[in-house]
Structure formats: structure tokens, C-alpha cells
Amino acid sequence: MEFLYNLHSGWHVDQAIVTEEERLVVVRFGRTADRECMLMDEMLASVAEKVRNFVAIYLCDIDEVPDFNDMYELNDNMCLMFFYKNKHMMCDFGTGNNNKMNFLPDDKQELIDIMETIFRGARKNKGIVVSPYDYNHKRPSD
């Protein structure tokens, strides 16, 4: 996991988001010991080298660094959030939550496609993009 960096404080999270000027910043917020979180980390590690030219990937344990739990509503055991030039990027996944991705994509290529779509939209100054895949079926039941 040489392309995945752990962030151990709120300051480190801020610096990761603020200082990256060219690439999309993807932060996996979650509980590191959770099964779904481990699966996402494994998927991120497997795509990290392929996307390293346009994506910087970071991991943040929400129990170790609770600073953003309220601000970003980090109630899930795992979620991805996307930032570009210090701006939160939103993506319409068809789940009703455009702020974060709180589910596992079906495969690695889907994850790469999502990152690429968000990156391309961000470079065009779009605040929200539409996911290339519809995840309406992954919507949490009420």
C-alpha cells in the first residue's frame, strides 16, 4: 500500500486537501477494522498505482481522528470523499447522497471510472458530476 497514506490528525487531513493542486484528493474515512472498510482499502490499494497521475489517496480512521465526523456527517463505517483544489467534489451516484460514496463499487474498473469522471468534472470547475454508474440499488433502506 505504498500509494495509500494514513492521516493521523485533523491537521494532516487539512494539509492533504489544501496542498494538492493538480490531482483529485480521495480520502477514505472509516473504521479501519470494519470489513467493508478493509475491502475498500484493498480496492484502493489495487488501483492506486494506475491512478497516481491524477489521484492522491489518503486513509483516515474516524475513531482516531474524529475532527470531521460532524462536519462531513461521517456516520458510516466507510466512505470516500473527493476534493479538488481544496473544494469538496460531489457526485450523484443515484443513492440520494451526493456528498460521499458510502458503498463498495462492484469492481476496480468502476472505481477508476468514478475517480476519472470526478477528476474530469473538477477540472471543468463543476461542483457536482454524475457517476458513470447508477447505484440506486445500493441505496440504504429506511
Curated annotation (Swiss-Prot):
Function text: Essential role in pre-mRNA splicing. Also essential for entry into mitosis (G2/M progression) as well as for chromosome segregation during mitosis.
Membership in a protein family: Belongs to the DIM1 family.
Entries under Gene3D superfamilies matching the protein: Glutaredoxin (3.40.30.10)
Primary location class: nucleus
GO-annotated biological processes: cell division; mRNA splicing, via spliceosome
Protein name according to UniProt: Spliceosomal protein DIB1
Subunit text: Component of the 25S [U4/U6.U5] tri-snRNP.
Compartments where found: Nucleus
Annotated gene: DIB1
CC terms in the record's Gene Ontology section: spliceosomal complex; U4/U6 x U5 tri-snRNP complex; U5 snRNP
Keyword vocabulary terms for this entry: Cell cycle, Cell division, Mitosis, mRNA processing, mRNA splicing, Nucleus
InterPro entries: Dim1 (IPR004123), Thioredoxin-like_sf (IPR036249)
Source organism (scientific name): Candida glabrata (strain ATCC 2001 / BCRC 20586 / JCM 3761 / NBRC 0622 / NRRL Y-65 / CBS 138) (Yeast)
SUPFAM superfamilies reported for this sequence: Thioredoxin-like
